[in-house]
Amino acid sequence: MAFTNYSSLNRAQLTFEYLHTNSTTHEFLFGALAELVDNARDADATRIDIYAERREDLRGGFMLCFLDDGAGMDPSDAASVIQFGKSAKRTPESTQIGQYGNGLKSGSMRIGKDFILFTKKEDTMTCLFLSRTFHEEEGIDEVIVPLPTWNARTREPITDNVEKFAIETELVYKYSPFHTEEQVMNQFMKIPGNSGTLVIIFNLKLMDNGEPELDIISNPKDIQMAETSPEGTKPERRSFRAYAAVLYIDPRMRIFIHGHKVQTKRLSCCLYKPRMYKYTSSRFKTRAEQEVKKAEHVARIAEEKAREAESKARTLEVRMGGDLTRDSRVMLRQVQNTAITLRREADVKKRIKDAKQRALKEPKELNFVFGVNIEHRDLDGMFIYNCSRLIKMYEKVGPQLEGGMACGGVVGVVDVPYLVLEPTHNKQDFADAKEYRHLLRAMGEHLAQYWKDIAIAQRGIIKFWDEFGYLSANWNQPPSSELRFKRRRAMEIPTTIQCDLCLKWRTLPFQLSSVETDYPDTWVCSMNPDPEQDRCEASEQKQKVPLGTLKKDPKTQEEKQKQLTEKIRQQQEKLEALQKTTPIRSQADLKKLPLEVTTRPIEEPVRRPQRPRSPPLPAVIKNAPSRPPSIQTPRPSTQLRKTSVISLPKPPTTAARGETSTSRLLQPTEAPRKPANPPIKTVPRPTPPVHTPPLSLIPSSKSLREVPAQKAIKTPVVKKPEPPVKQSVATSGRKRSLAVSDEEEAEEEAEKRRERCKRGKLAVKEEKKEANELSDSAGEDHPAELRKAQKDKGLHVEVRVNREWYTGRVTAVEVGKNAVRWKVKFDYVPTDTTPRDRWVEKGSEDVRLMKPPSPEHQSPDTQQEGGEEEEAMVARQAVALPEPSTSDGLPIEPDTTATSPSHETIDLLVQILRNCLRYFLPPSFPISKKELSVMNSEELISFPLKEYFKQYEVGLQNLCHSYQSRADSRAKASEESLRTSEKKLRETEEKLQKLRTNIVALLQKVQEDIDINTDDELDAYIEDLITKGD
């Protein structure tokens, strides 16, 4: 269908109310001002002036102006400014700050109601006027932006429509502060040179007391936040001069506020004992994955276009046949050239896609720089930049979160590129919160290492700060202003200043006379006392920062025990929370629920299965209290251990409660049998409080304590043919130890809990709409149907959204009374307006299955992820078999009809596993081969395979590194030997040539008529003389 046919269709409209809505993204007012400074920096400006002009007739009493000498804009560039979201800077390799095409509009509208922009480029002068006042007074709902243009030399209008130009200038004269053409031209004349931009914001926003939010009166050299107390507020939160000084990690643009230069800083040059740490991680993949998906999408479209053009060229060539007329050849040549061009473009797009796919697997490297702020020790924390622009400041990490003196006064600096972390629209945070927390955690670890490396704590923290003049016990008090302390601080941190002409940074040598010297705003290289750096032509010297290394200390047994105790406490809190749940049997019970409670607890473990945890470490098992020998019974060698499930029985009768006063016991069976009816989950009547072990601490005996919870807990239990014993004896020493999970698994667990909490709040609203579909029983859904529906997880499907089909994967399944719903997470979403996931009904017209890709077309990460999901599903199905339902906790006879593998097969598999583990056992593994040889199947189930694989890979890598280093040393030795031999060869050839020259000279003295021109002639002549002599 031709594009012209779309002219009658509806289009998205941008109302002028969106101007205000868009501006609310800037909670931090200085962030809005920084957006306009960023635009000047991206335009390669060397200077920007920020100043206020008094205009009492305007709201706020003054206009705020931003004048730079950057590249400026021509009319087409200025027209793209008013297109929200359009940016020419959005490339993965871009080092420019602007990426979203929104900063000028959102920043200016946050400061005031109206702004007018004057820009010059080459021979054009363009004015852009965006006014909410104009829209309000004219009653216009859509956004209208006048954009008149003049010739820079003749000042004549540049337009094809004189009437349109007249309307645009009339609006500018009526609603802007400049009411005549002369006043408008005067603004253009303020722009120095042939290019630059002037942005004027007026009708500023006011506070509740009628005063503007920006204070330009208290300090004539600064722009401050109105009504902000200096006490307890960081300088950058109160003073725009202080904020602009650290806004860029490597400032290359001069910033003037009210005509006074901002002394910009390179933070790494302002710290005591700076040290750099290189950090490499493969966790930062979100932005890179987005770029890969975009590149794949673009490459696929380019490939389709190229194939279509090639097909068209072949068809035309066949159809023309023997037609050799000139017009036919020209037409054929044009089609073929188009096909060749499109094929080249497709090849380029494919190479870009392949490069991005390779880059996705490469670990990202960041440089952490830490140092001590001895000038203001209370101003400490992490400064995190993105593409050299400050995003977060004073972020506390690691030991600083504890609030003590450890790591106090330390400042960290890191510059994160776009491909690692992407900032939010207001550039005050990062879009991916999970990866940002991972970055902070890594900086915390390196901060602790830096604190050890500089050894301040070993010398004494108080003594260290006393040396630099911090004599007060109050941490926030400034240092002493005595001259000796000022000199002491100045000796440790050399002065680094920027030249006003070449914009290069120069480090000045220390001089006692310059301790209290204030350098002028127009400092230049010729004022440098260093003779090697006293001219602008001299190259800039890089700061020499020592390189540090992160050394991870192994955890002590005490730390492991402490983490284990904390894990047990958390599990007990979960158990207590589960005991407080109430069943839902009718709509009356549903109405009694608080709003944040979901009414689908039964589907919860099926819809969101927990990721299997790591098994406990054998070292922890050995340190656990052993079972008393008096109650141990010999274990038959042929006894087969099986896993069973704790299921919840019906409420006990009075007689049964008398028999089990503190808890009800279940006797596990040899083989699991399916109950006749699915168990209805209820809460038992109140019983006296009892100390209950956590869910994962299940005694490995025949008597098991039932957990009175709303959810059916599925936990593998090891059975032994021991006679029943008293509860107090059975629980005395048989608690299984928990393995301490690593930090990343704990973080993922916390993420899942928060996500479930959010989904729980939404589930209540959905349940109220579907309340009429609830039955009187909470357990109507059959578990078999639920398990069958869960097999749909991981399916690759296509979903239709807004008449477009998008590929994705089923991540969750919800079984209703009448239908099954899939939650599909999309692989690639082209715009921010399309959701990243969506609930669809299975079998509807908006969803269809997609043929799964073959293994060779999947990336290693995809194959690994799919393998993990498949293993997790198999494990869940193996554990999810229900146990025979028992009444009132009475023991039942084991089912001997169930099929089971032979004991010899089990023992053979255990022996094979032991042999494999012994064969590949790492050298420094805590479990020896001797201990491994006597492990039984229960201990092998708890074997720490994750740590085993990790140490094996480390050992293998060390072995490879040793071979590599040995090969490298041999190669270096061979290269050195080769260079020596080549040197000797050259020396010998030079001696031979010199000898031949002397022989020729000697022969010419003896016989003047000898004519020898080449070395071969000389050799032949000498050989002939020797032959004649003989």
UniProtKB/Swiss-Prot annotation:
Phosphorylated by PAK1 at Ser-737 upon DNA damage. Phosphorylation is required for ATPase activity and recruitment to damaged chromatin. It comes from Mus musculus. Mg(2+) binds at N39. This is ATPase MORC2A. It is found in: Nucleus; Cytoplasm, Cytosol; Chromosome; Nucleus matrix. Zn(2+) binds at C499, C502, C525, C536. Residues 629-646, 856-865 have a biased composition (Polar residues). It catalyses: ATP + H2O = ADP + phosphate + H(+). The modification Phosphothreonine is found at T582, T731, T834. Essential for epigenetic silencing by the HUSH complex. Recruited by HUSH to target site in heterochromatin, the ATPase activity and homodimerization are critical for HUSH-mediated silencing. Represses germ cell-related genes and L1 retrotransposons in collaboration with SETDB1 and the HUSH complex, the silencing is dependent of repressive epigenetic modifications, such as H3K9me3 mark. Silencing events often occur within introns of transcriptionally active genes, and lead to the down-regulation of host gene expression. Keywords: Acetylation, ATP-binding, Chromosome, Coiled coil, Cytoplasm, Hydrolase, Isopeptide bond, Magnesium, Metal-binding, Nucleotide-binding, Nucleus, Phosphoprotein, Ubl conjugation, Zinc, Zinc-finger. GO terms for cellular component: cytoplasm; cytosol; heterochromatin; nuclear matrix; nucleus. Residues 532-543, 550-577, 763-772, 779-791, 837-849 have a biased composition (Basic and acidic residues). The modification Phosphoserine is found at S614, S703, S728, S737, S741, S775, S777, S854, S859. PANTHER family: ATPASE MORC2, ZINC FINGER CW-TYPE COILED-COIL DOMAIN PROTEIN 1.
